[in-house]
């Protein structure tokens, strides 16, 4: 390892030493390491080095909660820190600005668009978020570049950043990171150091029941898992026999409460309490329990019987909660608040995306300080939030991914399990599988726990959003931009791979010495042979005669040898044809983008005011929302009805059946007419558009928005519609951004009447519990 000065009061790991050396040379770094390995220190060292030079640093994260937490952590280190997310904007000219990656991407495109007359949304904030004097950008959780929906944002940022800005990329372990590193090295023409480590500072032990199924060296023990499955089967049989005995006694006229109570000990809740008590006795708390369902998070937290903390801890919790939440008196009417407070006084809590943001943060603060001994959380808690624990418990390995239920991928399991084991506190982290339903099969579990990590693939797409952003950006020709992308590097690699396969297949086929003319003659014989096989009588005799004539015209041994080889020759020919099709498709990517350009031009979105509107939109559907404004479709609606129409672009909440327009009670006839007209236009575009896009509008929030903008109570609305309070806040903040985008188009159009109508819209939306605030900003 290179010799570097260590500014910290603890020894550096080897991979950190290599990373520090690269940063000192102002060279780029890509670190891939497991959760809890200390890769965050690399980003913090870059900040230290840049600040010593008097330079600024941007720090990007994939989620708002991680952004808020990182803001607090860096502020605690004594730095001048700003924060920029979709909801919170504070001190964008600070020495260090923490932001979501989408904010950085919007800034990079906005810089190119200002020069062409496009006014991006919230341009005053973006203008103040200057790249001037920025020495480096830290991309935390950069493995998000692999995310199907959002990965393109990371790729676009890396494409558009100037080579003079140093890059520190921090990633979970990924497969074949060399391709990503090579692309960045070629693109920036700056050396990049790929520093990968599989080492875990705190080893993990993975268990089921009393069986260890994977050790600290990642050796999986299938026999142990099978023994546990067998023990579960015996228990299940015992429960079934017991229930039958209860039924027999009841049929005989007896009522045995003793027997009836026995099956409770086999219930999941009983096993959960038994496990928690055992962990408490053995000093293996705190524990993080992953429950991949928001509803069950709350249910299981409520089912914990024991108190896991002292009366002194309870007093401390009350003091901390009062200190942080006294500014939010409206919480007293929140069901979630009272549910959570009841759990907290036992040292138990829950954390999921539907929880009020400030309640999520109070849980994080209390967990970080050691007052929460048992936390039930969904997967989002594993993403980046630096909250290690002693023990991790999985209640299921199955998750819903929007398409259906599936097993966790190896990378997802690794990240979640990796929360176990606290550096400097534990010698070992414990991971327990305690299924709340039938356990996953052995093969699925083994693949999940020992399988390889996901290969990094480009998620860049060339839909209308990409074309609009590049078309209205100064010096942004899409053809040139594509050639700087990770997608293009992978595209060239695929072309080369297919060409190599084609050449190899051609060489294999050439062994059989069958040219095209021979191939046609052999195909003729195959046809005759097929006729003989299925014919009878005169037809068969005629075909046999044809075969004899064919053999006379094509004498042995050359033709007989060719006939024997023709099956293999045909297989190689089919493979070559398939490869040709793939190569042709790869060669035509420019054509597919040109079709999208033609689609936008034909519908009036290029070199037009309509196109400028569309280019301004980030939250809503660019084409539909801009068209609705351009045609004044919603202009005659009052404010609650206009906001309801904008809610069409907010996306729905999880419901078994999507709502329809007819399900709305409060929508006006004028709004219904406008929505139907917009739906017709959307169907027209969907029929014309060359590639798949989402043209669906969602009616889930119509009545919720009308009632909220009409000044009704948030908690009552949530109760009436069964909406999680956290989801409600997130949706209303998105509505606030949609209203800002609508105002931006009105400013571009100099539509004084619309601007006057919406002058006071924000206080109607952003009020009460709907506030873009974070406890981390005030700590």
Regions found by a protein language model. Give the residues of each.
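Non-catalytic terminal extensions of ATP-dependent helicases
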Residues: 349, 354, 368-372, 459-779
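Conserved interdomain linker/interface between the two RecA-like ATPase lobes of SF2 helicase motors
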Residues: 159, 166-168, 173-185, 189-303, ...
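Conserved two-lobed SF2 helicase motor
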Residues: 93-109, 346-360, 365-387
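Catalytic acidic motif of RecA-like/P-loop NTPases
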Residues: 105, 142-146, 349, 382, ...
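Helicase-associated low-complexity/disordered flanking segments
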Residues: 1-29, 55, 118, 203, ...
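Conserved segment of the helicase C-terminal RecA-like domain
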Residues: 387, 391-401, 406-447
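Conserved P-loop/Walker A NTP-binding site and adjacent catalytic elements of P-loop NTPases
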Residues: 10-203, 209, 286-291, 298-312
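Conserved C-terminal RecA-like helicase domain
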Residues: 58-60, 68, 75-84, 267, ...
């Amino acid at each position: 390892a290179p010799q570097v000065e260590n500014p910290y009061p603890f020894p550096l790991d080897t991979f950190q030493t290599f990373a520090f050396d690269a940063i000192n040379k102002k060279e780029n770094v890509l670190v891939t390491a497991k959760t809890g390995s200390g890769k965050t220190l690399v980003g913090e060292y870059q900040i230290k080095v840049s600040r010593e030079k008097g330079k600024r640093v941007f720090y990007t994260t994939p989620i708002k909660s991680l952004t808020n937490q990182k803001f607090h952590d860096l502020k605690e280190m004594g730095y001048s820190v700003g924060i920029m997310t979709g909801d919170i904007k504070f001190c964008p000219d600070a020495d260090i600005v923490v932001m979501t990656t989408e904010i950085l991407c919007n800034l990079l495109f906005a810089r190119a668009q200002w020069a062409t007359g496009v006014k991006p949304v919230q341009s005053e904030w973006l203008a103040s978020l200057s790249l001037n004097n920025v020495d480096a950008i830290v991309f935390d959780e950069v493995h998000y570049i692999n995310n199907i929906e959002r990965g393109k944002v990371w790729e676009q940022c890396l494409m558009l950043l100037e080579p003079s800005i140093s890059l520190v990329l921090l990633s979970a372990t990924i497969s074949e990171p060399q391709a990503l590193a090579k692309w960045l090295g070629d693109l920036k023409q700056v050396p990049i150091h790929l520093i990968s480590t599989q080492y875990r500072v705190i080893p993990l032990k993975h268990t089921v029941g009393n069986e260890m199924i994977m050790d600290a060296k990642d050796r999986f023990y299938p026999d142990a898992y099978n023994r546990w499955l067998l023990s579960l089967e015996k228990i299940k049989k015992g429960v079934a026999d017991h229930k039958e005995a209860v039924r027999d006694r009841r049929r005989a006229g007896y009522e045995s409460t003793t027997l009836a109570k026995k099956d409770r000990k086999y219930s999941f809740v009983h096993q959960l309490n038994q496990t928690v008590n055992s962990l408490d006795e053995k000093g293996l708390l705190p524990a993080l329990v992953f429950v991949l369902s928001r509803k069950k998070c709350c249910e299981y937290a409520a089912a914990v019987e024991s108190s896991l903390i002292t009366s002194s801890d309870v007093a401390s919790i009350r003091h901390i909660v009062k200190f942080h939440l006294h500014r939010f008196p409206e919480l007293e009417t929140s069901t979630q608040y009272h549910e959570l407070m009841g759990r907290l006084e036992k040292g138990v809590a829950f954390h999921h995306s539907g929880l009020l943001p400030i309640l999520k943060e109070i849980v994080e603060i209390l967990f970080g300080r050691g007052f929460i001994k048992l936390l039930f959380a969904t997967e989002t808690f594993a993403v980046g939030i630096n909250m290690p624990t002693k023990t991790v418990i999985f209640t299921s390995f199955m998750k819903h991914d929007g398409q259906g239920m599936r097993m966790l991928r190896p990378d997802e399991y690794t990240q979640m399990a990796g929360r176990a084991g606290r550096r400097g506190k534990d010698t070992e982290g414990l991971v327990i599988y305690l299924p709340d339903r039938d356990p996953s099969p052995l093969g699925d579990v083994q693949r999940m726990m020992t399988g390889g990590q996901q290969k990094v693939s480009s998620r860049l797409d060339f839909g209308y959003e990409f074309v609009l952003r590049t078309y209205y950006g100064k010096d942004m020709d899409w053809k040139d931009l594509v050639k700087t992308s990770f997608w293009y590097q992978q595209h060239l690699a695929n072309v080369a791979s297919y060409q190599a396969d084609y050449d190899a297949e051609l060489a294999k086929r050439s062994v059989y010495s069958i040219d095209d003319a021979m191939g046609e003659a052999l195909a003729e014989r195959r046809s005759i042979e097929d006729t003989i096989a299925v014919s009878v009588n005169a037809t068969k005799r005629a075909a046999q005669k044809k075969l004899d004539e064919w053999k006379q015209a094509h004498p042995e041994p050359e033709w007989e040898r060719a006939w024997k080889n023709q099956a293999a020759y045909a297989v190689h020919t089919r493979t070559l044809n398939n490869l040709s099709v793939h190569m042709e498709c790869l060669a035509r990517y420019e054509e597919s983008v040109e079709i999208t350009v033609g689609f936008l031009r034909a519908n009036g979105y290029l070199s037009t005011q309509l196109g400028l509107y569309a280019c301004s939109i980030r939250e809503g559907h660019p084409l539909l929302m801009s068209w609705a404004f351009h045609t004044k479709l919603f202009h005659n609606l009052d404010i609650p009805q206009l906001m309801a129409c904008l809610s069409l672009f907010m996306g729905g909440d999880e419901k078994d059946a999507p709502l329809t327009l007819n399900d709305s009670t409060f929508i006006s006839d004028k709004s219904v007419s406008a929505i139907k007209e917009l739906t017709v236009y959307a169907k027209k575009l969907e029929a014309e558009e060359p590639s798949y896009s989402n043209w669906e509008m969602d009616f889930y929030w119509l009545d919720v928005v009308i009632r909220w903008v009409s000044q009704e109570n948030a908690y009552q609305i949530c109760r009436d519609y069964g909406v999680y309070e956290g989801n409600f806040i997130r949706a209303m903040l998105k509505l606030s951004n949609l209203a800002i985008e609508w105002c931006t188009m009105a400013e571009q159009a100099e539509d004084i009447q619309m601007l006057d109508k919406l002058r006071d819209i924000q206080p109607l939306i952003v009020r009460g519990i709907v506030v873009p605030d974070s406890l981390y900003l005030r700590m």
